[in-house]
Amino acid sequence: MTNNMNNYPLLSLINSPEDLRLLNKDQLPQLCQELRAYLLESVSQTSGHLASGLGTVELTVALHYVYKTPFDQLIWDVGHQAYPHKILTGRREQMSTIRQKGGIHPFPWREESEFDVLSVGHSSTSISAGLGIAVAAERENASRKTVCVIGDGSITAGMAFEALNHAGALHTDMLVILNDNEMSISENVGALNNHLARIFSGSLYSTLRDGSKKILDKVPPIKNFMKKTEEHMKGVMFSPESTLFEELGFNYIGPVDGHNIDELVATLTNMRNLKGPQFLHIKTKKGKGYAPAEKDPIGFHGVPKFDPISGELPKNNSKPTYSKIFGDWLCEMAEKDAKIIGITPAMREGSGMVEFSQRFPKQYFDVAIAEQHAVTFATGLAIGGYKPVVAIYSTFLQRAYDQLIHDVAIQNLPVLFAIDRAGIVGADGATHQGAFDISFMRCIPNMIIMTPSDENECRQMLYTGYQCGKPAAVRYPRGNAVGVKLTPLEMLPIGKSRLIREGQKIAILNFGTLLPSALELSEKLNATVVDMRFVKPIDIEMINMLAQTHDYLVTLEENAIQGGAGSAVAEVLNSSGKSTALLQLGLPDYFIPQATQQEALADLGLDTKGIEEKILNFIAKQGNL
C-alpha cells in the first residue's frame, strides 16, 4: 500500500514532532485535515482501529505542538487512539504494516519508538504509570512534563481512580487529559467553556490562586470559604465532574472542544507550566470527520479492509463465530430461565451479547471496564440464588485473578466463565493473546475447566457449566467455528474425555480447537486421537489407559506449555508411575507477537505441518523411528 503524498502537502513535511513545531499555528487546521484523511486512507487499506484515532487528531497535533516530545513524556491509555501519534512520530510510511506480522504494533510500544513511553494494550494503566514517571522525573530534578491521555471508558476502572487518588495526595506535577467521546459525562461544550478554560488554566489565575492559598492558609475560616467559592464557580461554569476531580486533588479544567485546534493549543500552552496535578477534560466525537464512523463508532472501532468511498464494511457470510455461538446459547437459556444473568466488562459487541442485551435487558449487566467488580458482582448474584455468566476475554480475566480465587472458588459458587479469545488472537499481538488462562485457573481448587473442539461442543460445555453448580470455565477461540451440526443441549459427564480415533503407538490428547489438525495427522501416523474436553478434572483413567497401550503421548493445546493442560497430563503420569514418553505441544515461553492466527500457529509449529514435524522429531530423539 502506498499513499500519494501529493494529496498531503503539509503532512508530507512532518517526519517528527520537531517538524510539526516548525509550522505556524494557522497551518494546524489544514494539517489536522490531512492527518485525518491519511489515517482513513491507510486503515481502509490495511485494517485496524479507526474511529478512536479519527477522534483524537486535533488533540494529538496539539500535544506534540505544545509539548517537547520525546523529552516531555506523553502516555496513551490502551492505544486504540494513538494511530495519529504514530503517523506524526516517524512511522507514517510504516502504517501499511500496522497489526501485521513483522509490522508496527497496533498500540504504543516502547521497543518501537522513543515517543512511545509506555507499552500498552489493556486499559486504565496510563495514570499509574504516568505518576511513576512524573515522580521519577521530579526526583531527578528533570524539567520534563508528563501527560496521560485516557478515555471516558478507561477512566471508569478502579485502577484509574486509585492512581488519581494517589497523584492528588502526592501533588506531583502531571497532566491527565480525559478524552470524553460519549454524551453521557457532559454536554457543556461551547465558546463560553472554551473561554473559561483559558482563564482557569492561565498563568495569572494560577499565580493569584496559589499566592492566595499561601496567605489564606494562615486564616482557616477564610481559606475554607474561598475554597468552597472556587469549587462552586467551577461546578457552575464547568461540569459536575469538576468537583469530583478537585476533591481528588486535581485542578480541573474543562470540558473544552477537543476538535478546536486553536483552543487546545492555547489551553495546553497555559497548562504546561502549571504546578501540581492538572486535569483537562476534552470533548471529542469518535469517528470525527468521516460520516459512516460518526454514525456507527462501534462498528468502525476496529475495521477490516473496506471501501472508504462507500463506507460499507464487508459482511462476514461464513460460519458463525464462537462469540455468536455463545450469544445464541445465552439467549436460548434466558428464554427458559429468568435467573440466568449475563455480565460483561464493556465487551458487549465483542463477546456476542448484543442480541441478549436487547431481548433480556433485565438479565444483562455491562459493568464497564471493571473486571474485578464483574467477578465479585457475579459472586453476589450467585449467593442470591441467580446463575451468573461472566463473558470475558482470556487476556482480561487476568485482571480479576484474586476475585476468581477469593470470591468465587473458595466459596465454591456457581459462576460460569465464558472465556472468549482463548489461545492465539492474531493482529492485536502480545497484550491480547489468550495464552495463560488454563495455567492460572488449573491450580485453583473447585474449578471446572473445559476446552471445546467445535461449536457444538462449546454449547454443550456452556450448558454443563451452567448446570454443574460449581465454578466453571469454558474457553473458546477468536474467529469462526467449524461448521458442525448443533445438537440438543445435554450435560456432559464431568471430567470425561471422548475417544475419536483408535490407532497404535502414538496417542494425541487434544485440548481445544486444534482437533482438525490432530485428526488429519492421525491418518498419516496411525495415531489414536482423544478429545480430552476437560482440563480439570482431567480424565485420569483415560490417560493411564493410553499410557499402558501406547509408546508416545502427545498433548495439544493453545495455551502456555508451562502449567497448561499438557502439564496436567505429565502430573498424572508422574503420580501413576508411568514412564511413557510425553511430548507437550502448546505456546512457548515468550510473548507471542502480532500476526494472523494462521501465521502465528505456523510460526509456533502448531499447524498440521508443524505438529507432524515436532512429533516425528520427538520420536527420532527417542531412538525409535
From Swiss-Prot:
Molecular function terms, GO-annotated: 1-deoxy-D-xylulose-5-phosphate synthase activity; magnesium ion binding; thiamine pyrophosphate binding
Cofactor note: Binds 1 Mg(2+) ion per subunit. Binds 1 thiamine pyrophosphate per subunit.
Record-listed E.C. numbers: 2.2.1.7
Residues the record lists as binding thiamine diphosphate: H80, G121, H122, S123, G153, S154, N181, Y290, E371
Keyword Transferase: yes
GO terms under biological process: 1-deoxy-D-xylulose 5-phosphate biosynthetic process; isopentenyl diphosphate biosynthetic process, methylerythritol 4-phosphate pathway; terpenoid biosynthetic process; thiamine biosynthetic process
Pfam families: DXP_synthase_N, Transket_pyr, Transketolase_C
Enzyme class at the top of the EC tree: transferase
GO CC, alphabetical: cytosol
Top-rank lineage group of the source organism: Bacteria
Residues in the signal sequence: none
InterPro entries: Dxylulose-5-P_synthase, THDP-binding, Transketo_C/PFOR_II, Transketolase-like_Pyr-bd, Transketolase_BS, Transketolase_C, Transketolase_CS
Catalysed reactions listed for this entry: D-glyceraldehyde 3-phosphate + pyruvate + H(+) = 1-deoxy-D-xylulose 5-phosphate + CO2
CDD domains, per the entry: TPP_DXS, TPP_PYR_DXS_TK_like
Alphabetically ordered keywords of this record: Isoprene biosynthesis, Magnesium, Metal-binding, Thiamine biosynthesis, Thiamine pyrophosphate, Transferase
Annotated Mg(2+) binding sites: D152, N181
Associated pathway: Metabolic intermediate biosynthesis; 1-deoxy-D-xylulose 5-phosphate biosynthesis; 1-deoxy-D-xylulose 5-phosphate from D-glyceraldehyde 3-phosphate and pyruvate: step 1/1
Family per similarity comment: Belongs to the transketolase family. DXPS subfamily.
Xref: NCBIfam families: dxs, PRK05444.2-2
Role: Catalyzes the acyloin condensation reaction between C atoms 2 and 3 of pyruvate and glyceraldehyde 3-phosphate to yield 1-deoxy-D-xylulose-5-phosphate (DXP).
UniProt cross-references to HAMAP family, sorted A to Z: DXP_synth (MF_00315)
Quaternary structure (record): Homodimer.
Protein name: 1-deoxy-D-xylulose-5-phosphate synthase
Naturally occurring in which organism (per UniProt): Haemophilus influenzae (strain PittGG)
